[in-house]
Design a protein with these regions (language model features):
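Solvent-exposed loop and edge beta-strand segments that line ligand/cofactor-binding
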Residues: 1, 22-36, 87-106, 117, ...
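Well-ordered alpha-helical segments within folded domains of soluble proteins
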Residues: 1, 31-48, 97-113, 160-176, ...
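CBM-like carbohydrate-recognition segments
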Residues: 1, 7, 11, 15-18, ...
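Structural helix-adjacent loops and short alpha-helical linkers that scaffold large soluble proteins
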Residues: 1-6, 46-60, 112-131, 137, ...
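Aromatic-lined substrate-binding rim segments of carbohydrate-active enzymes
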Residues: 2-6, 294-339
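Long, well-ordered core segments of solenoidal/helical folds
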Residues: 2-18, 53-79, 126-144, 188-205, ...
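Active-site lining segments of carbohydrate-active enzymes
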Residues: 27, 41-53, 61, 65-69, ...
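Boundary/entry segment of secreted carbohydrate-active catalytic domains
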Residues: 247-303, 308
C-alpha cells in the first residue's frame, strides 16, 4: 500500500475530472465527491506519521482542484460528479446528494484530526469545514434526519441514516474540537442523534440506509448497509466524547451557557456510574454542592447513572421525564440518553 501511495505521489495525474464509468483513467483524480472521504485522510495521516510534506502537498493540490470542480459556491454544497451539473430535482432545485456531501464533511473531520494546529494549510480545511457545517445544519429536517436529496426532501420523504450519521459525526467533532459554536450546533446534533437511535430496531439493526449509488434514491425502513452502521458508530464516538470526561468516570451535560451566566446553580448536571461519596462531587470546583444536596438514581441504562441535584426535588421513579423544573435541561438529557 505504501509503495503504491509513493508511486501516486511521485507521478501525479493531470487527467480529466470528468468521471466516466468504465474508464479507469478517470479514476486517477478525485473525480467524485465520495473520494474526498476515501483519499485525503490517508495522505494527511501519512504526513502526520512521517512529517514528509510531499504527502501534505499532494493532498492539498488534489483537494483544492476537486473543490474547484465539484463545489457549488452558490449553494455551498458538493456535486457528486460532473454528471449532475445542470440537473434539477422535481422542485426545480439542483441535485445535491445527501450521502455524497456527508462523505465530504466526514472526510474533512478526518483530515482536520491529522493536521496539526498552526499548520499553514490547515486554515483552508477549517474554513471549508465550518462553511459546509453551517450549510448542512440549516438543511436538517424537523424529524432530525437529513434526506437523500438535500434540496428536495419532499421528493424523498424517507429518512436517510448514512448521511445523517456522518453529518452528526462531523458536527459533533466540530463542537468537541472547538471549531463550531456550541449554542448554535448542539440542538442540531442532539436532534440528529435522537433520530439515529430511533432508526435502530428491536433487533439492533439500523434502518433507512440508502443502498450503494450515486444520487438520491428512495429508501425504506428495512434497508441497511455496513457504511450506514459505520457512520452511526462514528457519530456515537463523538457523542460519547462530548459527554464523557476521560480524566474522570462521570458524564457532564449542561444547558445553554447564557442561562448559566445568569444563575450558575441552574446549569451543571453530573452523572456518576456508581453511588459515589460526597468527596467525588467536592473535588470538581465548577460544581456547587450544598451540604443538603441529594444523589439519586435516575436511569437503568448501560451505565448506572446518578444525578446530584440541589435546585429541585426529584422523584427517581419518574426518571428524566418527571423532571419539570428545567425543561431545556430535560431535553438535553433526553437527547443524549434516549434510545
Amino acid at each position: 500500500t505504501l509503495a503504491r501511495t509513493e508511486w501516486i505521489v511521485n507521478h501525479p495525474s493531470n487527467g480529466t475530472f470528468k468521471l466516466e464509468y468504465g474508464d479507469n483513467k478517470t479514476l486517477e483524480r478525485w473525480t467524485w465527491c465520495d473520494a474526498l472521504f476515501m483519499a485525503p485522510p490517508v495522505y494527511a495521516k501519512l504526513y502526520r506519521e512521517t512529517n514528509n510534506r510531499k504527502y501534505l502537498q499532494f493532498m492539498d493540490n488534489e483537494y483544492r482542484a476537486t473543490y474547484e470542480y465539484l463545489f457549488d459556491k452558490e449553494e455551498n454544497l458538493f456535486y457528486r460528479d460532473w454528471h449532475y451539473f445542470g440537473k434539477k430535482e422535481a422542485n426545480g432545485k439542483k441535485v445535491f446528494w445527501g450521502r455524497g456531501n456527508a462523505w465530504v464533511l466526514a472526510g474533512l473531520a478526518e483530515v482536520l484530526q491529522e493536521l496539526p494546529k498552526g499548520l499553514m494549510e490547515r486554515a483552508y480545511y477549517e474554513e471549508l469545514f465550518i462553511r459546509l457545517c453551517t450549510r448542512i445544519a440549516g438543511l436538517q429536517n424537523e424529524d432530525g434526519y437529513w434526506h437523500a436529496s438535500l434540496l428536495d426532501p419532499a421528493s424523498y420523504p424517507s429518512p436517510e441514516t448514512s448521511s445523517t450519521g456522518f453529518f452528526v459525526y462531523a458536527l459533533a467533532y466540530g463542537v468537541n474540537a472547538g471549531l463550531l459554536n456550541e449554542d448554535d450546533f448542539m440542538p442540531v446534533i442532539i436532534k440528529g442523534w435522537k433520530a439515529l437511535t430511533d432508526a435502530v430496531d428491536a433487533s439492533g439493526k439500523l434502518g433507512w440506509v440508502q443502498p450503494i449509488g450515486a444520487d438520491p434514491r428512495k429508501v425504506t425502513r428495512d434497508m441497511t448497509e455496513v457504511y450506514g452502521v459505520g457512520a452511526f458508530l462514528a457519530a456515537g464516538c463523538q457523542i460519547y466524547k462530548m459527554a464523557v470526561d476521560t480524566e474522570a468516570d462521570y458524564i457532564k451535560i449542561w444547558p445553554d451557557r447564557k442561562t448559566m451566566q445568569g444563575n450558575p446553580l441552574s446549569g451543571w448536571v453530573v452523572y456518576a456510574n456508581e453511588n459515589v461519596s460526597d468527596d467525588f462531587w467536592k473535588k470538581y470546583d465548577h460544581i456547587y454542592v450544598p451540604e443538603k444536596g441529594t444523589t439519586v438514581k435516575i436511569s437503568d441504562y448501560a451505565r448506572t447513572l446518578y444525578i446530584r441535584t440541589h435546585w429541585s426535588t426529584f422523584n427517581p421513579a419518574e426518571g428524566v421525564y418527571g423532571w419539570d423544573t428545567n425543561e431545556k435541561l430535560k431535553k438535553v438529557i433526553q437527547g443524549a440518553l434516549d434510545r
